[in-house]
Each structure stands twice: as structure tokens, then as C-alpha cells.
Amino acid sequence: MIAAPLDAVADSKGRKPFYSHLYVQVLAAIAAGILLGHFYPELGTQLKPLGDAFIKLVKMVIAPVIFLTVATGIAGMSDLKKVGRVAGKAMLYFLTFSTLALVIGMIVANVVQPGAGMNIDPASLDPKAVATFADKAHEQSIVGFLTNIIPTTIVGAFADGDILQVLFFSVLFGIALAMVGEKGEQVVNFLNALTAPVFKLVAILMKAAPIGAFGAMAFTIGKYGVGSIANLAMLIGTFYITSLLFVFIVLGAVARYNGFSIVALLRYIKEELLLVLGTSSSEAALPGLMNKMEKAGCKRSVVGLVIPTGYSFNLDGTNIYMTLAALFIAQATGINLSWGDQILLLLVAMLSSKGAAGITGAGFITLAATLSVVPSVPVAGMALILGIDRFMSECRALTNLVGNAVATIVVARWENELDTAQLARALGGQTEEGAPAGGLQPAE
């Protein structure tokens, strides 16, 4: 059995004090980090190791969490064809909503035009500022990305912490365990027993989340300053509002159609959302999200396949950002893109968003990869948004996280691998008597 999250078990003598909840501590740490970074920027920049150390601690356990969840989930399947069905349905969902996110970003950019009137001469931009990102973008390709999913060695996949490589091996190992039947029971029992201490370790590491969030936020504000936000407030505001509308309207409609409330889901994963907000890293929340989705009634086999894959292929926030930022650069530099140019941009973004997935700074590097193929928009124009990308990355990561949580529940429901009563209890949507109370409606 997977260990409960930090605040899942209430004190036997009564409810725990509000300040003992992880999400309250992380929220307070974020606020403290903002204040320290603003008033003492030099000290704030020196606290970067706190955030980096916490993210490394979490990444340390991501590989074993994925392996144990996927391998034991698939090993327990009676029908191995279901593995292919789950993966196929997940990829169909990812493709549909990733494309929709790209289109929404493009439409919003054309309607709001956040870069209009800036009149920046492209020749005045310094291409050296974004040279590193452009070089990394050129190193990425669809073929290279797909072949890189196969690890050179099993140990190498775990040592590097490559999510897709670990997932690839875990799926194959789980299938092998299922095929050997009784001969593999001892291995399955061992892996199931190992799951509890691994997730207990995750819970222990999460106690350091407030420290990591404090250090990361103090560094961000200390280095970039609140002033950098004000300079490009139109773009930042447009992106944040668009992402919010995407979550509450688009994903909200998907959630409602599938029998649950997006607001209740956000409340349920609030700790993971605040963790992402504080660290700007969606990977920091991956173990906790997998744990909570299983506790919400999604079968382990679905959780293990959908969430790690979604971290590379279901990047709704990143996709909104890509088309919105690309058109912002064009508008700011006075470049008028025809609808043909914009469709080309959309098609290239659909491919490059997959080829650059799973790498550090994926959003910015993916944008560089897209612009390098579309000659109308100068790659050097990315220098305009380099200073605010850190603030944009938080919104990208938050939207990506919510998108993957919704995707997991939807795919589980499609496969009849969702315990709707358990989901209702997890989201707080049922009374003690078990009757629906608004958080979850019966699925049609």
C-alpha cells in the first residue's frame, strides 16, 4: 500500500493546526522568498542552492517511483492488450489537447496583440543572448528524440533520471513479469512491498519543500526583480489569463463531461500546485501527483503510463506559450505574419514540442526550435522575453500539471479503470452517507 501524503492522516486528538499542512508552509515560504528577494536581492540570489538541492532530492526518487508504479501496475493486468489501449488512448488525448492549446495561444495572440506598438528593430537585438538555447534547439530532432527513449543500459536510465527511458524499461519489465505468471510472483510481491518505503521516503523529502520553495523564489525575484515583470506586463498578463481560461473553461468542460469538478481537483492537488509555483519545476510534483491520482481511484497501471508520458507529450501550458510568444515577437518587431505563415508556425510547433520534451528549459528551447524553422520570425527576438521567461515558466508548469491530472482521470474512465466512488471521496464530493454532494456527478 502506498504511504499517505504528509497531511492525509489527521491527528487522532483532533484536526491538525492549519500551519502544519504542507501547502500552508509552502505558500508562506513563497511569500517570504518574494519579500527577501525584493528587499535583499543579493542575498536572494545566493539562496539558489536551496531550490536546486530540493529539486535534486525529488529527482532522486522519480525513477524508482515510476518503475515501481508502472511495473507492478502492468504485472497485475490480466489482459496485456490493455497496455497498448491505455497508451493509445493517452496519446490520442495528448495530441488533441496539445494541438488545441497551440491554436488557443495563436488565436489569443491575434486578438489581444500583446506585442503591437513596441516597434523594435530586429537588427538591434543581440542574438548572442539566446545562442545557447538556439544551439540546444538545433541538437533536437524527432528521430533523435524517439531513439533516445531506448536507454543504452538499464543502469544508465536510472542514473540519468530520464523519465521516458525509465518508463520504457518499466513497461517492458512489467509485461515480462505478467507473461511469466507464477514464476514472477515473488518479484511482484517484493516490488509491492518496496513501494511503501519508497513513497514514505517521498513524504519525508516533501518536508523540505518549504525550504526549497523559499530559496527558489528568493533567487528568482532577487535576480530578475519585480521590475522585469512590469516591462512586459502585457505579455505576462495575457499568458496567465489565457492559461487560467484554458484550465477552467477547456479542462473544466472536459472534467465536467467526465463526471468531476475541476475546482475540486485543483483543491485536491493544491500541495503539488504550490510546490510547482515555488520551484518552477513540474518534476518536483511528479511523485506526489502519481500518489494522489492512485488514491483518487485511478488504477496504478493507468497512472504509471499516463503521467510520466504526459510529462513529455501533454504540455498544454508550454504549447499555449509557444504560439503566443512567437506571435508576440513578430508583433514587437513589426513583422506581419500571413495566415499561411501562422499555420506553418503551428505545424512546426506541433512537431518541435515533442522533439524538445523532457529537457531543462524545454519551453524556451522548444520556442527556439520552432523559430529556427520559421524564417519570418527572428530567433534573436527571443532576447525580448529572456528576462521574464522564469516568471512564464511557473505558469507553464502549473498548466502542464493540471492537464496531466485531468488526462489521467479521463483515460482511466475511458478504460473503466476509475473508481468513481473513491474519486468522489478524494475530491470531497460525497457526504458521509455516500450520496453525491456536487464534487462528482455520475458519469454517463
UniProtKB/Swiss-Prot annotation:
The chain crosses the membrane at residues 17-37, 57-77, 92-112, 139-159, 161-181, 201-221, 234-254, 320-340, 368-388. GO terms for cellular component: plasma membrane. Its main location: membrane. Signal peptide: none annotated. It is a multi-pass membrane protein. GO terms for biological process: L-aspartate transmembrane transport. This is C4-dicarboxylate transport protein. It comes from Rhizobium etli (strain CIAT 652).
